[in-house]
Amino acid sequence: MVKSVEDVALMGIRQDMVQAIWEQAKPHLEKALEHSDGEFKIDDVLQFLLDRAMQLWVLYDISTHDVVMAGCTEIVVHPNKKICRVVLMGGLSMDLWQSQTPVFEDWAREQGCVQMETLARKGLARKLTELDYKQIYQVCRKEI
């Protein structure tokens, strides 16, 4: 049973291993999708992972090896910089995930990224400021 940040580890999943861990990661990603605006369906996420358009990350319980959180990143290439965007994140307490952000950041640097970003609801945006994230934009949408 996960009780603290010492009980978990974050691991990036190689594209050729996505199918092997998918059933453990899928429920956490589906939970994250419940809070989205319908940009993706779970089958879309799997296809993006298999196509290497996104990367799968899992937070697992060190003692049981159970997946307790899952998330996806994507590399966004702009003309003047490369950014690693956290697209989805779902599972247990955000505090557990926050403790592992250096793993994401180190990997992103290795890919040539100079920034991390995520689209976040207000509550998560407040928590991310504790990790030196700055709110840059407000996203507004209208159905047409």
Predicted regions and their residues:
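Conserved catalytic-core motifs of GNAT/GCN5-like acyltransferases
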Residues: L119, K134-I144
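Active-site rim helix/loop that mediates acceptor-substrate recognition in acyltransferases
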Residues: H35-L56
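Conserved donor-binding loop and adjoining core beta-sheet/short helix segment
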Residues: D51-M94
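Short, flexible, glycine/charge-rich loop motifs used to bind or transfer phosphoryl groups or to couple energy/partner
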Residues: L46-Q47, E74-V77, D106
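Secondary-structure boundary/capping motif
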Residues: K3, I83, D132-Y133, K142
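Short glycine-aromatic motifs
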Residues: M54, E130-K134
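Acyl-donor binding region in acyl/amide transferases
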Residues: K81-T129
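Short amphipathic alpha-helix that is part of the acyltransferase structural core
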Residues: M1-F40
